[in-house]
């Protein structure tokens, strides 16, 4: 017999006779093990909870009602801007810091690192510069709502770069944030996009699109544009990097580079009275006695200590004798040896020559920076061969511990050589690798209001050779560019010092050393003659809102349109008219709560009038310059049915207004009259009051109609 499902329902016990067993929660199912494992006793599974016999009551949905303006417009702000570009030897510069100043033809521009923010104010400034397009106007719409954005990054042909973004407040911009724009630091962070060049990924997409929502703490509600315009919607950073040669330049033997600077014992000083050589003699070149013109070189072993005495400024003959004596005993030896013992020379040296020859004694180098020992005076007439102290550096040996990078200003001294101001340090970073500290250091100092002519880069590091013990950075040809050359044939009869430096090194002089250290770091661009370009496209989605219908252009007679010479196209680009969000005052608009029984309240009218009277000059952003200079009439407002919410431009003083004022006086006087005594008098009083109110409503309607006719001439066709 074939089994079939019974069509009738099986019999069940009555409700009062049903037997209920204790309900237990079903155990969770588990997968069958796929491999053998060591068996162990599991903890017994416990069942929690109870079975409900009655269905749980459905919770009512709580409806949160939010104000929605009656007039709304969707707006998409789309723009295409340069993200990064830099010229030769500008890899460590900040893009926006090196872009605003007008450059000569041979000067470089841009930078290899950058950061920025997007806000409604920034987007409006870009609109004024012509970098983006707004799909809808925000005139007469003071409310704004933000829905997110899309960022499109385009792949470059030869350059690779990194883009990092965040929409999580708090947003901050400080020195640590700027040094974090180094490529190695950017690769280690999250929320980044690595855009490799087309040479490395020839078959990849040409662009990458990122969808970014509103900030994490921003509520999806309506804001006043005046309060919302300065809110940061997105913060980002970008930098170029070198994925092909990240650690050592192509063709180089090692990671060591050389930069130049001045040691701490030869600080120059700016002064109104002395040149650098006189400061060097009276304050810094110590170990020279005043007892005699003859001083042994043995006394120079402990030079520049606080116990030594100061000496006078040496003349030209003494310098020449010192040169010959130095060349005759140019034999390297340990620091503690009796160096050049017994050689008596007149050494009251106080100029650049001392700074040059001191390198041999303290660093065991060649006694003359331009060649072998025994250099003649003729060889010294070529300052282009002079160079400051050289320091070797490698990023692979820099551990960061004990490093110090800052900017310092020069102490000024009085006419007696006494220091009047201490050496000030600012923008200091400690215990970090030098290749990381120098990122955008020059532009950060300029952004903090530091004058580059009065400040210098200060470095202390144990990972250079020789050790950079409180040095001032300079470039290699600093001496050749800043030495006042002798214009006389005989240097002995010169009025000024042949080797006098007329200024101390500043931030601009230290940029070469900063660039060398930055390019030595990992993943930084290594080629000196390299350049780069990167492009970004963005689309921000907004909604404008308000209680008044925004203005729309009215059709005009085509036969009365103006005529232009040349091609038949209008002189304007057809962009939407945009108001500055920071100028949209909500007090200058009427709102639904400003009406009482179909009429505007006096306080609302007074508020709007005061707000409009406060604006003495029209906003520069209402209409762009040249929009109404071609004979076109200004856009007229469309007819609105119902009660108007526009402030009247004139105060009519006709019969209706006089009647309304008289009625206001009589109504106040009637309130003080006595109450009718008989029912007949009461009925007459009510009838007169009804007639007055009817007449009052008619006069108010005619008065409002006249005001609307003055504001909108189109209504004359509807109300003759």
UniProtKB/Swiss-Prot annotation:
Where is it found, in Gene Ontology cellular component terms?
Answer: T=1 icosahedral viral capsid
InterPro entries given for it?
A: TTvirus_Unk
Chain segments carrying region Disordered: 546-569, 616-691
Q: Which UniProt keywords apply?
A: Capsid protein, T=1 icosahedral capsid protein, Virion
The Acidic residues compositionally biased stretches are: 652-664
Q: Which domain of life is it from?
A: Viruses
Subcellular location as annotated: Virion
Q: Does the keyword Nucleotide-binding apply?
A: no
Query: Which protein family is named in the record?
Result: Belongs to the anelloviridae capsid protein family.
Query: What biological function has been recorded for the protein in this entry?
Result: Self-assembles to form an icosahedral capsid with a T=1 symmetry, about 30 nm in diameter, and consisting of 60 capsid proteins. The capsid encapsulates the genomic DNA. Capsid protein is involved in attachment and entry into the host cell.
What is the name of this protein?
A: Capsid protein
Organism this protein belongs to: Torque teno douroucouli virus (isolate At-TTV3)
